[in-house]
Structures are given as C-alpha cells and as structure tokens.
C-alpha cells in the first residue's frame, strides 16, 4: 500500500510544490493553509564561493475567502530564510506576495510579487532536485519572480475547453534607487525593469502539454547607461527586453519529459556584465518515478549569447553563458520526507570570457535532506 501511495503522491508534490499543506482554518467560506520546507543542503565544488553549507527554509501560506457564490478572494505569501549564515546577517527575502479575486469561469485577477507569465512554460523544466531553471532568473524582466505583476488568468478557456489556459500580464517599472529613474523600490540595474506586458497559452491533454509565452519590457536608463555610470555601458543595449518561448511536456505513466526553447533580446543576463543582445536558451529534462519512491533525473541546459559585443576592451561574438548536464535522483520516504543528490556537470571552459563575466565553470554536487509540509 505504501508503495502505491508514493507512486500517486510524488507527481502531485512536484506540481504543488508542497507535500501536504497544513490546513490551519476552514470555516464559513474562509480557508487558510500553511506550507513550507527545511532543506539541509550541502554543496561540494572547487568553486569556493558556493562550496559548503547551503541550508535554507521556506515558509508560506495560501488563503481563500468565499465572497459570493460567484466570487472568491485569495492570497499567497512565501518567504525564504537562509540557514547557512550568522545570526547577525539578514539573509532572508519574500519570494511571492500577492492577492486576487476569482470570478468563477470568467477568470482571476491578482497583483503583487509573483511569477512572470514566461514561467508558465519554462517551469516545466524547472523540476530538477536542486539545480535547473537557470537560463533565466528572478527579477529578470518577466521571466520568473518579480515585483509589480498584475495578472489575469483564464482556466479551461472560460470553462469551455478543458486543459486550455491562457494569461495576460502587466509589470510596472522597478527602477533605480536614485536619480531620474528612481522608484520607491529601487535596485541595481541588473534587476531593474521598465513597464512590460506578456502573455502565455498552454494546453494539456491526457498527459501531453504544449505551451508558448511572450513578453516585452521597456529597459531602464541605468540598464542602457553603464557599469559605473561614467565609462563603459552594459552590454546588451536596447529600448526593449523581449522573450519568446515554447515548450512541450509529457507527464503520465510514471514518466516525465519536458523541453523548452527560449529566444531573448536584451533580456538574458551575461554574468555581471549586462545582457546578451540575443540569446538562445534550451532546457530538457527526463525523469521516471519508481513505485518505491526513487525518482532519477537527467537534464541538459544551455544558454548561448549571440553578438555579445565589447567586454573589458575585448570583442566577443557568440559565447556559451551556461551549459551543463545534470544527473540526479530524489528518494521520497513519505509525503513529508525526502533526500536527494544532484550533480551539475559544467561544460563551460575556464577562459577569458567566463572570467570577465564572473561565470562559474566548476562542477557542483548537491546533497540534501528535506522535510516539507
């Protein structure tokens, strides 16, 4: 019985992101669930900047309130706390925080810190035990988590077509901490964005899925101005940052296969030097869920920058920004406890480009023991 339960449970965990959220309150149309995990995590690598303890905790809640028969209010908050630093260091941050309204079959609208619509498709390959999902990053225009997202979603196409979902999204400007481009939540140029719009559409049928997403954001003056505001500009200058992505997945019969291809313009970060004028990003993953709780994983990820331009006085054309094979496995003891190993086999060469951009070229082995609820 335990084996059969695990075989049914694990795919649900991967989708939900939480093993079994603890129901704190459910009465009179109001519901509040608490979820979280503690990951006792250690990296082994020749790169001393990541080698060692990486332990962290995540905690969040999801709430709903029934306003009328047709209208439901909801909200979600998730926080991460690093467990590998001294107590006087402030290494914690909000991952998501948003509130919204759902109008039955009409759709839902929410606002806050959330995931960009591009992640509706690229998330299909972001399922590795520890690594993965790094041909993009957080606060990277509309490619992953970010601030100021206003999102409309329709599930099952207004209730008319099962499995057909679409979303339309707007992101407000998150600019500089000072000067003309200042906003109340100003940040470094690599994590800024101007006003942006995006959309996604996905279709799932009997385990098969196909999806596409696009986004276009204005770039800020800081992003087009320079590394030190006086001399060299960041690479990847342009009025807009654009992303076009497509993906496929299969999730049935204990098999999970997914792949996504994304082409970006002035949107993919090149280490700490700016953005690629054009980048081609590819991720593919294959996993199998054994009935006794073991889930091996194999993946390949590559991000190739095109026509990068001049960096530190050197002219670079086409360079790999990221390229690795990932081999890993997770073992689920039950719905709340798991352990994993994840080996990132870095295929990048240590050369002048990677040194200029501050890109890691070393392999990493991650070992983790996870309690989640």
From Swiss-Prot:
Keyword field contains Transport: yes
Transmembrane segments: 34-42, 54-63, 74-84, 92-101, 107-115, 142-154, 164-171, 197-203, 208-215, 244-250, 255-262, 272-288, 294-301, 325-332, 337-344, 365-372
PROSITE patterns found in the cross-reference section: GRAM_NEG_PORIN
GO annotations of cellular component type: cell outer membrane; pore complex
Gene3D superfamilies: Porin
Entry keywords, A to Z: Cell outer membrane, Host-virus interaction, Ion transport, Membrane, Porin, Signal, Transmembrane, Transmembrane beta strand, Transport, Virulence
One Pfam family hit: Porin_1
KO phenotype (gene knockout): No effect on propagation of phage Sf6. Upon infection with phage Sf6, single deletion mutant has a wild-type level of small plaques with no change in bacterial survival; double ompA-ompC deletions have about 10-fold fewer plaques, survive infection considerably better than wild-type, are infected more slowly and have fewer extracellular vesicles associated with mature bacteriophage.
Family label: Belongs to the Gram-negative porin family.
Protein name: Outer membrane protein C
Native organism: Shigella flexneri
């Amino acid at each position: 019985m335990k084996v059969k339960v695990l075989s049914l449970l694990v795919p649900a965990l991967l989708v939900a992101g939480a093993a079994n959220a603890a129901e704190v309150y459910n009465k009179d149309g109001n519901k509040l669930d608490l979820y979280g995990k503690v990951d006792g995590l250690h990296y082994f690598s020749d790169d001393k900047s990541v080698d060692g303890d990486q332990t962290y905790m995540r905690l969040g809640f999801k709430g709903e309130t029934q306003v009328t028969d047709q209208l439901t209010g909801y909200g979600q908050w998730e926080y991460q706390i690093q467990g590998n630093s001294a107590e006087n260091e402030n290494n914690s941050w909000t991952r998501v925080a948003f509130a919204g309204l759902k109008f039955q079959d009409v759709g839902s609208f929410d606002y806050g810190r959330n995931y960009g619509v591009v992640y509706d498709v690229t998330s299909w390959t972001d399922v590795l035990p520890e690594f993965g999902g790094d041909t993009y990053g957080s606060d990277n225009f509309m490619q992953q988590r970010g601030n100021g997202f206003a999102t409309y979603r329709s599930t099952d196409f207004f209730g008319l077509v099962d499995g057909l979902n679409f979303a339309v999204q707007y992101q407000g400007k998150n600019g500089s901490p000072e000067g003309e481009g200042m906003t109340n939540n100003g940040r470094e140029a690599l994590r800024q964005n101007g006003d942006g719009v995006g959309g996604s559409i996905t279709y799932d049928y009997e385990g098969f899925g196909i999806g596409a997403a696009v986004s276009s954001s204005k770039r800020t003056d800081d992003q087009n101005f320079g590394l030190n505001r006086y001399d060299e500009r960041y690479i990847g200058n342009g009025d807009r940052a654009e992303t076009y992505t497509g993906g496929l997945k299969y999730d049935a019969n204990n098999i999970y296969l997914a792949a996504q291809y994304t082409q970006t313009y002035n949107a993919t970060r090149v280490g700490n030097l700016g953005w690629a004028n054009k980048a081609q990003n590819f991720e593919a993953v294959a996993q199998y869920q054994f009935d006794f709780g073991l889930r091996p994983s194999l993946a390949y990820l590559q991000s190739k920058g095109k026509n990068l331009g001049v960096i530190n006085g050197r002219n670079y054309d086409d360079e790999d920004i990221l390229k690795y094979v990932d081999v890993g496995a997770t073992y689920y003891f039950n719905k709340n406890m798991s352990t994993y190993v994840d080996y990132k086999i870095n295929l990048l060469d240590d050369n002048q480009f990677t040194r200029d951009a501050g890109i890691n070229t070393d392999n990493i082995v991650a070992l983790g023991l996870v309690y989640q609820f």
